[in-house]
Amino acid sequence: MSKGLIHPSAIRSGLVDLEMAEETVDLVHKNLADSQAHLQGEPLNVDSLPEDMRKMRLTNAPSEREIIEEDEEEYSSEDEYYLSQGQDPMVPFQNFLDELGTQIVRRMKSGDGFFKIWSAASEDIKGYVLSTFMKPETQATVSKPTQTDSLSVPRPSQGYTSVPRDKPSNSESQGGGVKPKKVQKSEWTRDTDEISDIEGEVAHQVAESFSKKYKFPSRSSGIFLWNFEQLKMNLDDIVKTSMNVPGVDKIAEKGGKLPLRCILGFVSLDSSKRFRLLADTDKVARLMQDDIHNYMTRIEEIDHN
């Protein structure tokens, strides 16, 4: 008989569950009624809407819901140039940059100068942007100056007399300063290319040893390890600062191995407060002088041989 009895606590818990279920049903019914309240009222009058809202209509698409403006007068012809919907122009551009980065890494590993590689890469990027994103000029605008130039060229008359070579004409005297400018420009370009090659060699060797740690004397009469990564600097800034180290440009011009520990110490003393706190500056200065002297001696021996 005791097995068939139901405990009063089970009855009370069952009643509580029933009450909670009823409350849940009421809450769901209320939410449904609130969400459909706009369907129970009067329909909206389009004329009562703001002017901007009256110009728009809703269309049901199979994949998404689009809002289309009915006012076609504000349509701009410039929008025809851009890609259609669903085509992201950044996807092919990102693929182009990935391929370009792979080529840059491959060329740096082969020993090419950094600035020479970057000049070629920048031209590739400019060409891609101009051909993909920029709008080409129309032929009408190009043909106009061509026609005016052809009409403005005077034809030689029958009374034309040749000018002796020892007496230059006015046009030659006016354009006499053009040739020296071209010579100066070529000389400046040649000097710039030489500087770019030297800086590119420095950047190449520094980049190869960016994470390599070098030993420096510390203030506690010991040593500590330091590398280029701890400077938190760009490679271009490191190269510009390292060009102030005496003899670095000559060693890079000869294609020799650079005193990277000396360069790291010089740049760190100039740019890193943490390095100045850790290092014994006097010992670091002597260490840098010894490195420069040893590397310059090797270069001189190679030149003599």
From Swiss-Prot:
Keywords: Chaperone, Host cytoplasm, Host nucleus, Host-virus interaction, Inhibition of host innate immune response by virus, Inhibition of host interferon signaling pathway by virus, Inhibition of host STAT1 by virus, Inhibition of host STAT2 by virus, Interferon antiviral system evasion, Phosphoprotein, Viral immunoevasion, Viral RNA replication, Virion
Bias-annotated ranges (Polar residues): 139-151
Gene Ontology annotations of biological process type: symbiont-mediated suppression of host innate immune response; symbiont-mediated suppression of host JAK-STAT cascade via inhibition of STAT1 activity; symbiont-mediated suppression of host JAK-STAT cascade via inhibition of STAT2 activity; symbiont-mediated suppression of host type I interferon-mediated signaling pathway; viral transcription
Superkingdom of this protein's organism: Viruses
Post-translational modification Phosphoserine, affected residues: S63, S211, S272
Nuclear export signal, short sequence motif: residues: 49-58
Pfam family, one: PP_M1
MF term (GO), any: RNA-directed RNA polymerase activity
Family stated for the protein in its record: Belongs to the lyssavirus protein P family.
Protein known as: Phosphoprotein
Organism expressing this protein natively: Lagos bat virus (LBV)
Name of encoding gene: P
